Each structure stands twice: as structure tokens, then as C-alpha cells.
């Protein structure tokens, strides 16, 4: 059920990519103005995450996810009546941003912490892959609806999904395995089930976690790398790739299909990343992911003008590590701050991710308005990813090598 809610939230976060050009044409709004609303939504998605972790500890995932789906559906549906940019900012930016923020990746980390004793990296990788799956399922359909029936019907479709899911989550989901007479997956027989976190004031809990984490070098390295991660994914490619494709004469449905193709490879890459994060040095994994992403973004401006399968090559290599950074980053946070505190700290790392996404979404929209293309935005993001590939090597310590007992004859 968590996967379904995160999938729906991810699909709605990706929807503006197919709305930018139709909104430009209908209302005459500039791409920079439209990007402001998207930036606000991305920013709130991140900033609410740490407090959402506190809400989950106090009220449980079931109530929190049901509320999130309702807010997402309400905010999305309300945009069909908007007439001016401030309404788009208030509805999509604020209301939808708050709703998706409650279902930030930190929610998946909290659920994994409760339901899994082993294979946590793999489980988080599968939940993180919901973003890829959301694009895979929804974006080509939404693009086709926009082309044939207009952007309003596309919005109604995703709003309906969210509003239907909300009561189902409330009625069906359970907060922890004990509620169903189960133990966390892989918990050894006879070992006591970890006590759930004590519910308290979510604001105090989130701010206390930030105060504690901010004294750590690992926090700033992980938050800084995730800032660049957000800028180079949700903020830039997730928001502006479809409009950039249309600038080069690629039809909207075909451009959405490119994102869906990336979603297929990201589903593979992120799930595989979760498996790898349980077994290998997570810093080396992050170095590989950011390096591959940086090279892909540096190639993208040339992919637009190359003949043949230039964009397909980009989609494969960029897609493989789009959200693959989540499991190793969460694992490093858990290693640095412990199982109990890491979900709240990871919430602040997600906040940094979305601050980067918001800045990239607005900056790329402004660059497109001023320069007429996105080339510099893609190139800057590529170099930042290469910088991050080096920086993550300084996070944490290498896991100690296993000590082998001498064999006796």
C-alpha cells in the first residue's frame, strides 16, 4: 500500500512536465512564471518531510498517508478552475506541495524501519522505485490525454486516483506488523520486537534532529550531495525535459515516452541499488551514480541535435541511476545517526534534495526564458554531479572488514 501511495504521489509530481507548454499557450504565462509554482511544490515536498516523519511517529503511517492522498487530490483537482498564476502557485505549489511532502521518501524509510529487520536497503530501493513506476505508468497516458482532450482532463485523471486511494489506505493499511500479529521481516525468533518510537511534538522532534545532525560532517556531505541530486533530477530533468524535447521538435507524447523509458531503467537501477547497498561500500556506489549522471547530463545537449538514438542513449544511462542514490544515502544516514534517529535526519537530507530541486526548476525556467534553450542548465547540472561524485567519498567510514576466526585442525 505504501508503494501505491508513493507511486501516485510521484506521478502527480511529474505531471507538470506535460502541463508547462499547454499552460504557456492557453494563459500566455512565461516558462519562468510557471516554474515558480513547480518550484514551490518541490520545495514544500522537501521541507515538510522532516515534520512528516514526526507525524508518522505520532499518528502512524495509515492516517498520514490517507491525509496526504486527500490533499494531493484536492489541490490537483482545484487547478482546473484557475485563471491566474497566483492560483497555480497556491493550489499546485502550496496545497499539492504539502500533500506530496507528507509522502516524501522519508515516509518509505520509516515504513521500512518498522516492517523490515533485514534487507532494508532492498526494501527502500523498491519503495524509491515507485517514482520511476509512477512515471512509467502515468506520463505517456497523461501526455496523450493532454494532446487529445486538454490538460484539465489529465489533471482530473490524477486527482481521481489520489481521491480514491485516500479512503482505501485509511481502511486497509496497518501501522506496524504487530497490528497484524506479525514480526518485522527477518527478526530472529525470540528476539523482542523493537518498541515503536514514542510519539511527541513533530515540530520539536524534527528540529531536535536537525540540531543534532548539523554538528556532524556526514550530515552536511550527505545533504550537499542530495541538494545536487534534487537539482539534477526532479528540478531539472523531471520538470523541464519534456518542454526541452518540444523545443527541439519532439512531440509531447514521444517526449513523455522518453521519460517512461527512463522510468523502466530507473526501476531496475534503484531496486538493484537497494540490493547493492546491503552489500557494498555505499560511498563508492554514490560516486558511481553521480559520476554516471554527470556524464549523461553533459551529453544531453548534444543528444538533442544528434541523429539516430542519441536521446535513447541518454535515457538508458541517466535512467539507471535517477533515484538509485536513495538507498545508499539512507544507509549512510542510518550508519551515522542510528536506526532510531535516522528517519528524521534523512528527512532533512530530503529537504536539501528538494531545495536543490526547487532552485533548479526555477533557474532552468528563467534560463529558458532568457536564452531560449536549456543547454547551460544541463551542463551546469552535469558538472555539479561530477563534483558530488568526489565529495561523497568523504562521508562516513568504510565498514570494517569481517574478522575471520583462525581454523583449528
Predicted regions and their residues:
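Hydrophobic core of transmembrane alpha-helices in multi-pass small-molecule transporters
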Residues: 75, 87-103, 227, 310-324
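Helix-loop-helix hairpin linking two adjacent transmembrane segments in secondary transporters
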Residues: 127-179
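Helix-to-loop junctions at the C-terminal end of transmembrane segments
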Residues: 48-61, 270-281, 368-369
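Cytoplasmic helix-loop-helix junction between adjacent transmembrane helices
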Residues: 92-129
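Intracellular juxtamembrane helix-capping segments at the cytosolic ends
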Residues: 23, 102-116, 324-337
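C-terminal ends and interior cores of transmembrane alpha-helices
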Residues: 70-83, 292-305
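Extracytoplasmic gate region of multi-pass secondary transporters
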Residues: 16-20, 211-271, 360
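Extracytoplasmic
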Residues: 1-31, 48-52, 139, 236-242
Amino acid at each position: 500500500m505504501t508503494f501505491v501511495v508513493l507511486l501516485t504521489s510521484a506521478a502527480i509530481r511529474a505531471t507538470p512536465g506535460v502541463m508547462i507548454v499547454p499552460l504557456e499557450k492557453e494563459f500566455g504565462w512565461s516558462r519562468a512564471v510557471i516554474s515558480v509554482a513547480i518550484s514551490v511544490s518541490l520545495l514544500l515536498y522537501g521541507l515538510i518531510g522532516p515534520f512528516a516523519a514526526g507525524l508518522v511517529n505520532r499518528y502512524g503511517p495509515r492516517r498520514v498517508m490517507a491525509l496526504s492522498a486527500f490533499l494531493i487530490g484536492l489541490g490537483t483537482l482545484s487547478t482546473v478552475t484557475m485563471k491566474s498564476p497566483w492560483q497555480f502557485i497556491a493550489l499546485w505549489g502550496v496545497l499539492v506541495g504539502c500533500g506530496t511532502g507528507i509522502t516524501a521518501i522519508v515516509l518509505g524509510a520509516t515504513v521500512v524501519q518498522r516492517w523490515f529487520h533485514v534487507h532494508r536497503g532492498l526494501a527502500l530501493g523498491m519503495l524509491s522505485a515507485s517514482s520511476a513506476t509512477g512515471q512509467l505508468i502515468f506520463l505517456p497516458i497523461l501526455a496523450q490525454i493532454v494532446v487529445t482532450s486538454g490538460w484539465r482532463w489529465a489533471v482530473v485523471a490524477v486527482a481521481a486516483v489520489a481521491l480514491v486511494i485516500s479512503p482505501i489506505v485509511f481502511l486497509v493499511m496497518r501501522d506496524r506488523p504487530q497490528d497484524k500479529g506479525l514480526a518485522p521481516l527477518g527478526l530472529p525468533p525470540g528476539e523482542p520486537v523493537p518498541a515503536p518510537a514514542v510519539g511527541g511534538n513533530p515540530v520539536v522532534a524534527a528540529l531536535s534532529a536537525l540540531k543534532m545532525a548539523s554538528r556532524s560532517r556526514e550530515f552536511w556531505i550527505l545533504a550537499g550531495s542530495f541538494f545536487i541530486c534534487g537539482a539534477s533530477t526532479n528540478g531539472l530533468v523531471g520538470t523541464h525535459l519534456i518542454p526541452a524535447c518540444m523545443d527541439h521538435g519532439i512531440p509531447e507524447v514521444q517526449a513523455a515516452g522518453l521519460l517512461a523509458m527512463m522510468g523502466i531503467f530507473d526501476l531496475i537501477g534503484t531496486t538493484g541499488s537497494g540490493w547493492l547497498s546491503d552489500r557494498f561500500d555505499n560511498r563508492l556506489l554514490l560516486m558511481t551514480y553521480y559520476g554516471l549522471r554527470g556524464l549523461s547530463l553533459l551529453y544531453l545537449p548534444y543528444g538533442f541535435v544528434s541523429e539516430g538514438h542519441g536521446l535513447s542513449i541518454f535515457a538508458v544511462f541517466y535512467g539507471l541511476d535517477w533515484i538509485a542514490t536513495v538507498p545508499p544515502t539512507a544507509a549512510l544516514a542510518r550508519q551515522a545517526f542510528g536506526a532510531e534517529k535516522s528517519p528524521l535526519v534523512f528527512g532533512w537530507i530530503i529537504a536539501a534534495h528538494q531545495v536543490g530541486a526547487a532552485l533548479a526548476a526555477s533557474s532552468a525556467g528563467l534560463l529558458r526564458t532568457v536564452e531560449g534553450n536549456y543547454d547551460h542548465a544541463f551542463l551546469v547540472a552535469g558538472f555539479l554531479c561530477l563534483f558530488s561524485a568526489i565529495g561523497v567519498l568523504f562521508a562516513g567510514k568504510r565498514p570494517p572488514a569481517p574478522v575471520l576466526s583462525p581454523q583449528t585442525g
